[in-house]
Regions:
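An active-site-proximal "capping" alpha-helix that borders the catalytic cofactor pocket
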Residues: 17-31
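A generic secondary-structure signal for well-formed alpha-helical elements
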Residues: 30-34, 57
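Divalent metal-dependent catalytic cores for phosphoryl transfer on phosphate-bearing substrates
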Residues: 3-14, 24-25, 43-178, 182, ...
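Non-catalytic terminal regions of proteins
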Residues: 124-262
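Short, glycine/acidic-rich hinge or "gate" loops at secondary-structure transitions
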Residues: 35-44
């Protein structure tokens, strides 16, 4: 869960699964004369849209920090065995639907613990912290399965799609976490043949929720995308049950963003 505290102490709460749906919208519209459309299209878009499905368990019973009473941001949640089981459930679920999507989802999950495999130089934020000592088994088991699955696909194409998935993830995370954007994502693939140069994508707030993206990678200009979030009128709670009651009662609010060329 993405937790943003306003100056007045009220909260904006965004489920990881809602953030992922925003990533999926970006993936679905990716591609124009300068940027290659994702391929295989459905598999890449599906992976982006559901890449954080492993957070459903936590979102069903979110909690607070014991010392502050404030809801935990996703970067504060420890990847203990229950959370790792939820991640592996999501990988298995997606793999049953589409093995390629499942492989992308799995590689994304382990990549968060491996510095995104060095494939992205900017931003450096949003990599996983709070890893338990016994997490290496999770990594080894899933990376072994990934290596076996990857033999069925074009490896260069897969890593291009991995970079694209990170790009969709970052765009959504920026939109979810900030009111004013002035950010960079790189390197961003523009083709699958490796001949076209990689892009340095900038995102800057024009006004309100209108965001300029340069170079512009989408099929519609401007592109309207939507995020669902919740707002709560207090920042701290006496116990987890009090927070969950407020969270469950909060009315979902749809926020539209307009992504445009500079």
């Amino acid at each position: 869960m993405i937790v943003r505290e306003r100056a007045d102490g009220t909260l904006i709460l965004i489920g990881q699964t809602d953030h992922a749906k925003l990533s999926g919208q970006c993936a679905a519209h990716w591609g124009n004369q300068y940027f290659a459309k994702p391929k295989p299209y459905e598999a890449v878009v599906r992976a982006a849209m559901f890449h954080d499905s492993g957070w459903y368990d936590y979102e069903a019973s979110p909690t607070i920090a014991a010392d502050t009473g404030k809801p935990l941001n996703f970067m504060q949640v420890t990847w203990g065995k229950p959370q790792r089981r939820a991640f592996e459930w999501a990988i298995d679920w997606m793999t049953r639907i589409d093995p390629y999507s499942g492989l992308l989802l799995s590689k994304h999950r382990t990549g968060l613990q491996r510095g995104r495999y060095g494939k992205m130089t900017s931003p450096k934020a949003f990599n996983t912290q709070n890893l338990p000592e016994d997490n290496e088994d999770f990594l080894e088991r899933n990376e072994e399965a990934q290596a076996a699955a990857l033999r069925n696909y074009d490896e260069a194409e897969f890593w291009t799609n991995y970079q694209l998935l990170q790009t969709f993830d970052f765009i959504s995370l920026f939109l979810c976490n900030k009111d004013t954007l002035d950010d960079v994502i790189e390197p961003v693939p523009t083709s699958y043949d490796g001949k076209a140069p990689l892009a340095r994508l900038t995102l800057k707030t024009v006004a309100g929720t209108k965001i300029a993206v340069d170079p512009f990678p989408f099929d519609n200009d401007p592109l309207r995308v939507q995020l669902v979030r919740r707002e709560i009128g207090r920042g701290a709670f006496a116990d987890p049950a009090a927070f969950r009651e407020a969270y469950f009662k909060a009315i979902p609010v749809a926020v539209d963003f307009m992504l445009c060329s500079p």
